[in-house]
Amino acid sequence: MRWLKPKASDAKKLAIDPPEPRAGRHGIAIAACVKNEARYIEEWVRFHQAVGIRHFYIYDNGSVDETRIILRSLLNEDALTIIPWAGRMRDAATSAMLNGQVITFAHAILNFGGDYRWMAFIDVDEFLLPKEAATVEQALDAVGDFPNVSLPWHMFATSGHETPPDGPLTLNYTMRGADPMTTKESVSNFKCIVDPCEVTEVSVHQFQTRAYGDLTANDAGKRFTRRARKSPEFYSNRFLQLNHYYTKSRQELMEKLARGWAYDSNATKYRDKVLSVVKSIEEDMVDDRSMIDFIERNHIDLGR
């Protein structure tokens, strides 16, 4: 009967049994999906190495540029795992597109999570910026033993660059949307850092854990429900800030629109969404130089 048909949204989350913690588990790993990121991935890796990331699990969606070569030149086997992960999948019963990122994140937790105290699930245009400490793990001391941390996007657009400027991405783009908790559609969202050995439900932007269900904490350790984290009261960037370099230059934005998104089959819908997000960001911006200050203070070599 039609009313029993699963909703398309069911393809966007997965229930799992948490992995068992392995002896000596420690540190933070990042799991990320990539495709043809050769232009900027060196900077992303160098920065996150500098802030204490122990291992990178890279799910490669069919890159044809030098992404893999660059990664292997920067990281040894103790710090890098590349998993080929090309293609799209649909639910056979409903024809709903399965979210490839959700599947990779669940795979990362189940196969590798037992080795780590924390796993972060971000994209390669997103940077985890400690605000007071030198490393991400030190910044997470503020949440204590709580297993589910949500970091709001701080959305950066073109910063007036028509073409790609010389030098590091993180030093060239400083203009971001003023309100990370805006209610404008698709401009506000979260990425998560979790204790993988407690996760029971996986999605791109939210997780559930065994002891706390859908409760999640901000970077200061203040706990909210999944729905309530969208309230202004949830906002904090005192200890850890997630910078999302959404467009880069205007030229790169146009290239992004021409490529489409690997996990969205509707090119027109994707283009309209991206342009709407950019417009919303650029309507109200602030100059945020906290990344530059951190890089200079800690003498981080970004390789560009």
Predicted stretch roles:
Residues 54-62, 83-86:
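Short beta-strand/loop segment that forms part of the nucleotide-sugar
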Residues 1-12, 98, 130-304:
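Catalytic-site signature of metal-activated, phosphate-bearing donor transferases
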Residues 54, 117, 147:
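Short acidic/polar active-site loop segments enriched in Thr and Asp
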Residues 68-118:
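Active-site-proximal specificity loops/subdomain of glycosyltransferases
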Residues 46-55:
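Short, acidic, metal-binding catalytic loop of nucleotide-sugar glycosyltransferases
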Residues 32, 59-67:
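Ser/Thr-glycine-rich phosphate-binding loops at phosphate-binding pockets of nucleotides
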Residues 116-129:
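Short beta-strand-to-loop acidic/aromatic patch adjacent to the donor-nucleotide binding site
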Residues 1-46:
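N-proximal low-complexity "stem/linker" segments adjacent to membrane-targeting elements
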